[in-house]
């Protein structure tokens, strides 16, 4: 897995029950995706000078496993679990460093997206080769 995010659960991220509200899990996972795309493909939001392609999330499955409270220190690690014709699947794990528990996981399917046609496009052999270096296949239960 690749370390893609370090965060803290600030008080303003927490609800009246004192734990981090779901909107901030999504934000942290979303930020971590940029780091994963950079690690795997060297891609940043501004790296395509001609503004032709980008990655678009088309499915998120989040499993909230343990409560995150105010002040908890978090890390997100990610791995590429599948390379399809037009999509990749990334599995991310948010760990609470204070108790060493997995707080949440995200399975995300991302398609390569043509910004002009607004449709998914086939992953090139060059991108496939780059991605294959980070592919960690998992069992079907993940």
Residues of each region from the PLM?
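Terminal targeting signals and extreme-terminal segments of soluble enzymes
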Residues: 1-73, 81-142
């Amino acid at each position: 897995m690749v370390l893609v995010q370090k965060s803290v659960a600030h008080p303003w991220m927490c609800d009246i029950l004192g734990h981090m509200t779901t909107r901030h899990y999504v934000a942290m996972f979303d930020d971590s995706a940029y780091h994963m795309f950079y690690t795997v493909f060297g891609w940043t939001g501004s790296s395509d000078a001609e503004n032709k392609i980008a990655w678009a999330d088309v499915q998120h499955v989040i499993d909230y496993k343990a409560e995150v409270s105010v002040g908890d220190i978090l890390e997100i690690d990610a791995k590429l679990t599948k390379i399809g014709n037009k999509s990749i699947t990334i599995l991310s794990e948010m760990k609470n460093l204070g108790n060493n528990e997995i707080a949440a996981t995200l399975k995300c399917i991302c398609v390569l997206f043509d910004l002009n046609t607004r449709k998914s496009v086939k992953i090139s052999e060059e991108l496939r080769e780059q991605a294959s270096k980070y592919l960690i296949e998992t069992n079907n239960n993940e």
